[in-house]
């Protein structure tokens, strides 16, 4: 009798644990900490310090784009590469894991794609070194 009970309890425990893990994966990798706004957008719910970090990151992109534009206007492809590399994938590692869990999957995909795109711009600026090519990548 006890063997039969064990044979039923263990799979049930495993199933419950798998459901808990699946729920956590959905919450922290797919959904994040979000809510719908009345205008249909998705708001990411962050603590004030996390919000400040996110805004700093966005300002960094604007500043980096300004640096790239200025370097392009001077045909300074080394300057383009330097500015683009500063916005590349290495910068994505600055985001704390707790904050990363609050970001929805679509946002994470966009962020990693954007950082990767700037790495590509940096590499192409060094190897291809054509300002028009870089402008095409930015558009």
Where are these predicted regions, by residue range?
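Sequence context surrounding c-type heme c attachment/ligation sites in exported
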Residues: 10, 27-139
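Hydrophobic membrane-insertion alpha-helices, especially the h-region
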Residues: 10-27
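N-terminal positive-inside, membrane-proximal cytosolic segments immediately preceding the first
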Residues: 1-13
């Amino acid at each position: 009798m006890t063997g039969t009970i064990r044979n039923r309890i263990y799979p049930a425990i495993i199933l419950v644990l798998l459901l808990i893990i699946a729920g956590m994966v959905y919450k922290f990798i797919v959904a994040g900490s979000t809510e719908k706004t009345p205008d249909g957008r998705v708001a990411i719910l962050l603590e004030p310090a996390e919000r400040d970090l996110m805004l700093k990151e966005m300002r960094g992109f604007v500043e980096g784009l300004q640096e790239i534009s200025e370097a392009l206007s001077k045909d300074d492809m080394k300057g383009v590469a330097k500015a683009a590399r500063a916005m590349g994938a290495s910068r994505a590692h600055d985001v704390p894991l707790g904050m990363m869990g609050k970001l929805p999957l679509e946002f994470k995909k966009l962020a990693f794609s954007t950082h990767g795109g700037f790495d590509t711009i940096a590499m192409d600026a060094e190897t291809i070194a054509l300002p028009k090519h870089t402008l095409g990548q930015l558009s």
